Amino acid sequence: MAKASNYYYDQLNKEQQRAYYVIKEGLLKLQDSFAVPMLSKKELSDIYFLIRMDCPEIFYSVNFSYRHYADSTMVEMIPQYLFSKEKIREHRQAMESRVKKLARQAEKLDELGKELFIHDFIVDNVKYDKLKKEYSHEIIGALGNGVAVCEGIAKAVKVLCDELNIWCIIALSEANPEKGILRVEYSHQQISLHERVFRTA
């Protein structure tokens, strides 16, 4: 079953998809700024957020500013990075190594076994962060520090599922915290992190 790494990208119109692609590439390359199609600030903010839901490995930028020039069809987006570029590369390498090391332990399991491996890893190694410590909303909190809020845990599950080629999205809700949704053998599984169980949806 294919991973759902572009789930939110696929929900966008063509112009928004162009902006998504440029922003994602700019963030992956750690560019100081890049030109994106001119969209409303809300659209750009939404796209920036959705990239981080599709690609939780982009944990090092959560905000941006932009400049618009008269008579231009583009805006210059300026990402705000949480760390220096050198530190981002170090953290990124550490997270990639951690994810690959964990995935190797489960790669020979069937899909349900992989899902249970991820579940057990999260339950045994990640504490819910009531104090909302630094980076607890990102994979670096869950996989690096062992503490995270629902969003950080859902992102950790997503990045592990992507590595193991399990379909998974981070479900968004205004009323409830983010949750990871996995599709295993024609059923959908919701990760309920407070109850520490997987439920069939």
Question: What do the predicted segments below correspond to?
Answer:
Residues M1-R98:
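Linear, non-domain "peripheral" regions
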Residues A19-V22, C55, C150, C161, ...:
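Generic recognition of cysteine residues
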Residues I47, I118, A156-V157:
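Generic structural signal for hydrophobic residues
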Residues L82-F83, N125-D129, A148-C150, E174-E178:
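Solvent-exposed loop/turn segments at secondary-structure junctions
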Residues F83-A142:
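Secondary-structure boundary elements
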Residues I139-I153:
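A short, highly charged nucleic-acid-interacting micro-segment common to nuclease
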Residues G152-A201:
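Hydrophobic/aromatic-rich core segments of domains that either
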